[in-house]
UniProtKB/Swiss-Prot annotation:
Subcellular location: Mitochondrion; Mitochondrion matrix, Mitochondrion nucleoid
ClpX-type ZB domain mapped to chain residues: 93-146
Residues bearing the modification Phosphoserine: S617
Source organism of this protein record: Pongo abelii (Sumatran orangutan)
Family annotation (PROSITE patterns): CLPX_ZB
Biased composition (Basic and acidic residues): 69-83, 598-610
Chain positions with N6-acetyllysine modification: K437
GO cellular component, as recorded: endopeptidase Clp complex; mitochondrial matrix; mitochondrial nucleoid
UniProt name for this protein: ATP-dependent clpX-like chaperone, mitochondrial
Catalysis: reaction(s): ATP + H2O = ADP + phosphate + H(+)
Enzyme class: hydrolase
Domain of life per record: Eukaryota
Length: 633
């Protein structure tokens, strides 16, 4: 690979700083530091001069050296001084002559020997001739070869800037419609939000890059291409430090290199330059979303389905496990860590992702415990404030130990956050604000504030005698009038609610929608059970009346679509027990089976009687001995 003198990625750091034995005796105060890494796929050498630019380094490829002196590239010149003589992670039999590849010094070509340490297996080797030490890279490190870095850097940045045009909202809506039944308003909001997120990524290019493009007209580079080049340099610099085992922000060497890279990047206008500027660029800001609705209405399913069709990283995080910093539980930074993991630890790609915060209503504060520290409620909301608005989060690096403190900085300014929660009892709070009675079952004016009081009131008013359809319609009507003060009374702090400007209420599922959920969408409930029975060569037939009866049972349980699977498991328990290894070829379920008036019907295949098969299976039916005696006589 050619020298990197034309880029701004800085110098590459190596895993082991080596020098000659004479230089080691004089100390490292000389005018030159020599660093070498011996890898399975190649050898990377970097020379850093005291007063030379840090970015001036060279790279020498290396190949395997076989026993007969012929290199893997087929040159076969056998020159010991050639840097293309091989290296591998394992030396095989070494000097014993039993075959296998041998480690050779990339400087002089002489054989290297393992350094004896107190550890049984060492990765360090030494050249006896030129007294150089090398470290043998592992399989994981060899996969991150320096030779492949420019290609991976270009791919990582072009994913964000040179992708195909973002899908229109209608196309995203149609895709969600294949898997999620109903919730048309929520689908439209999510589709538009994702589309605008794509546009914000593609258009929020710093203004200084446009000015730089005007200055560098001879390069004929567009602002987007300049941004790609800059991010390629940053990406390559970060990956070189990771391969060398050095954090970009963890020591003096990495810090100095990062400072040099930052100095070469044009900064935004500040101070007097802003006052004198006559042109202001429009920067698109994000609009975080809050989905609220009853349990089983499809909030999490919408997020899971949306994650499949996106070209940006998408992470789903459960807020119930989050705690304030310093307490047992998952830290708030783990939200961004999951997004970084989904982006394959590409920081630039993760900074343009989408985070789905599930069960966000569970971190609501609980009134009445002010003498205690609410580490799982209000404390988590306070920790999420800057995360939602946009800040730099320190996330632990990949394969880094906690004690070492190596972190990666991720900017959350362009990360879109979508929160969701059931908010049980929120309709009671809205009803109290509107001074309305709730279906004639008393007034909640004497109830306390907070999510616990609201949930208790909602549970107390659940009665089997109430009209289920009327109850659902009333709740949906109230949720459509939700305001920020209702969420604050529920237990969310005002600062948290203000950072979620788009509030989307999801409606409850009625009987017709539940019947559609059973059969229509891809990966529906009934086709899943039909696939289970087909593995035992059996069919499952469910009548239309049975589907409606199942939907009515789910409505009475008030658990939404999740109640459908519970009902189906109870109905099909006996058939799933009887069908395997039997002659049943069809199971029929009708309305009476759902209502518990009779058992499921079975259709059996015609049997072929054979005395030999009965004898082999050990089955003795009544009258079988007499038939056998008659046959023998």
């Amino acid at each position: 690979m050619p020298s990197c003198g034309a880029c701004t990625c800085g110098a590459a750091a190596a895993r082991l700083i080596t020098s000659s034995l004479a230089s080691a005796q004089r100390g490292i105060s000389g005018g030159r530091i020599h660093m070498s890494v011996l890898g399975r796929l190649g050898t990377f050498e970097a020379q850093i001069l005291r007063r030379a630019p840090l970015r001036s380094f060279t790279e020498t490829p290396a190949y395997f050296a076989s026993k007969d002196g012929i290199s893997k590239d087929g040159s076969g010149d056998g020159n010991k001084k050639s840097a293309s003589e091989g290296s591998s992670k394992k030396s095989g039999s070494g000097n014993s002559g039993k075959g296998g590849n041998q480690l050779r010094c990339p400087k002089c070509g002489d054989l290297c020997t393992h350094v004896e340490t107190f550890v049984s297996s060492t990765r360090f080797v030494k050249c006896e001739k030129c007294h150089h030490f090398f470290v043998v890279l592992s399989e994981a490190d060899s996969k991150k070869s320096i030779i492949k870095e420019p290609e991976s850097a270009a791919e990582a940045v072009k994913l964000a800037f040179q992708q195909k045009p973002p899908p229109p909202p209608k196309k995203i809506y149609n895709y969600l419609d294949k898997y999620v039944v109903g919730q048309s308003f929520a689908k439209k909001v999510l589709s538009v939000a994702v589309y605008n997120h794509y546009k914000r990524i593609y258009n929020n290019i710093p203004a200084n890059l446009r000015q730089q493009a005007e200055v560098e007209k001879q390069t004929s580079l567009t602002p987007r291409e300049l941004e790609i080049r800059r991010r390629e340099d940053e990406y390559r610099f970060t990956k070189l430090l990771q391969i060398a085992g050095i954090s970009p922000h963890g020591n003096a060497l990495g810090a100095s290199m990062q400072q040099q890279v930052n100095q070469q990047i044009p900064q935004e206008k500040r101070g007097g330059e802003v006052l004198d500027s006559s042109h202001d660029d429009i920067k698109l800001e994000k609009s975080n979303i809050l989905l609220l609705g009853p349990t089983g209405s499809g909030k999490t399913l919408l997020a899971q389905t949306l994650a499949k069709c996106l070209d940006v990283p998408f992470a789903i995080c459960d807020c119930t496990t989050l705690t304030q910093a310093g307490y047992v539980g998952e830290d708030i930074e783990s939200v961004i860590a999951k997004l970084l993991q989904d982006a394959n630890y590409n920081v630039e790609k993760a900074q343009q992702g989408i985070v789905f915060l599930d069960e966000v209503d569970k971190i609501g504060s609980v009134p009445g415990i002010h003498q205690l520290r609410d580490v799982g409620g209000e404390g988590v909301q306070q920790g999420l404030l800057k995360l939602l608005e946009g800040t730099i989060v320190n996330v632990p690096e990949k394969n880094s130990r906690k004690l070492r403190g190596e972190t990666v900085q991720v900017d959350t300014t362009n990360i879109l956050f979508v929160a969701s929660g059931a908010f049980n009892g929120l309709d009671r709070i809205i009803s109290r604000r509107k001074n309305e009675k709730y279906l004639g079952f008393g007034t909640p004016s004497n109830l306390g504030k907070g999510r616990r009081a609201a949930a208790a009131a909602d549970l107390a008013n659940r009665s089997g005698e109430s009209n289920t359809h009327q109850d659902i319609e009333e709740k949906d009507r109230l949720l459509r009038h939700v305001e920020a003060r209702d969420l604050i009374e529920f237990g969310m702090i005002p600062e948290f609610v203000g950072r979620l400007p788009v509030v989307v209420p999801l409606h409850s599922l009625d009987e017709k929608t539940l019947v559609q959920i059973l059969t229509e969408p891809r990966n529906a409930v009934i086709p899943q059970y039909q696939a289970l029975f087909s593995m035992d060569k059996c069919e499952l037939n469910v009548t239309e009346d049975a589907l409606k009866a199942i939907a009515r049972l789910a409505l009475e349980r008030k658990t939404g679509a999740r109640g459908l699977r519970s009902i189906m498991e109870k109905l099909l328990l006996e058939p799933m027990f009887e069908v395997p290894n039997s002659d049943i070829v069809c199971v029929e379920v009708d309305k009476e089976v759902v209502e518990g008036k009779k058992e499921p019907g079975y259709i059996r295949a015609p049997t072929k009687e054979s005395s030999e098969e009965e004898y082999d299976s050990g089955v003795e039916e009544e009258g079988w001995p007499r038939q056998a005696d008659a046959a023998n006589s």
